Amino acid sequence: MGSDSEILNRELSKLSDEDLLACTKEELVNRLRKEESDKMSALIQRGRLIKEVNKQLQGHLLEIRELKVINQRLQEENQELRDLCCFLDDDRLKVKKLAREWQLFGHHAAKVMREDLGGYLKKLADLERMQDGLVKENLDLKELCLVLEEECVSRSDSSPGGSTDLNIPCMVARDVGDGSSSTGSVGSPDQLHLVCSPDD
């Protein structure tokens, strides 16, 4: 029995002719059906495995297609970013150049303004000195007019022809300004000569 069960557990293809002849028809039929059933189960299992592998392959192919689409989109975005970077870099260089030009212009303008301001300050100082000189000159002329007026009045009072007519022109010659206006020139020697000229 031990040898018979061992023979049954072995595949038919691995049995020798003597072992096959030793088996009965029922044993051979059962053995054959068992092997066919095992082979069918193996084929079914293999088919399932193939379907599973195909399904996984389809999933991988779909994932690869999606990755290709994503890669293409990323390449396009990368190219757009490159173009944008080039544009921004050109714009940056233009702005940098413009800023440098404005800086040079600012330095030049500041230099010119300093020079002009220095000239204006010098002219202002000269004008102030001239104004001070004119004020002093007007004060001197005013004092001179007062002296000449007093002299004219005294000469008019001492003349025998009457002093009323001569006193009025002498009073007109007085400068009532503050010494800084142009009317202070009324007391110039030429005009005083005309005013007080009856005795000349």
Swiss-Prot record:
Residues 178-188 have a biased composition (Low complexity). Disruption phenotype: Morpholino knockdown of the protein results in neural tube closure defects and a disorganization of the neuroepithelium. This developmental phenotype is associated with an alteration of cell-cell junctions. Residues 178-200 are annotated as: Disordered. One of its GO terms (cellular component) is nucleus. One of its GO terms (biological process) is negative regulation of DNA-templated transcription. It comes from the Eukaryota. It holds the Pfam family CCDC85. The keyword Cytoplasm applies. It is found in: Nucleus; Cytoplasm, Cytoskeleton, Microtubule organizing center, Centrosome; Cell junction, Adherens junction. Residues 57-84 form a coiled coil. Keywords: Cell junction, Coiled coil, Cytoplasm, Cytoskeleton, Nucleus. Its main location: nucleus. Functions as a transcriptional repressor. May inhibit the activity of CTNNB1 in a TP53-dependent manner and thus regulate cell growth. May function in adipocyte differentiation, negatively regulating mitotic clonal expansion. Plays a role in cell-cell adhesion and epithelium development through its interaction with proteins of the beta-catenin family. Belongs to the CCDC85 family. This is Coiled-coil domain-containing protein 85B.
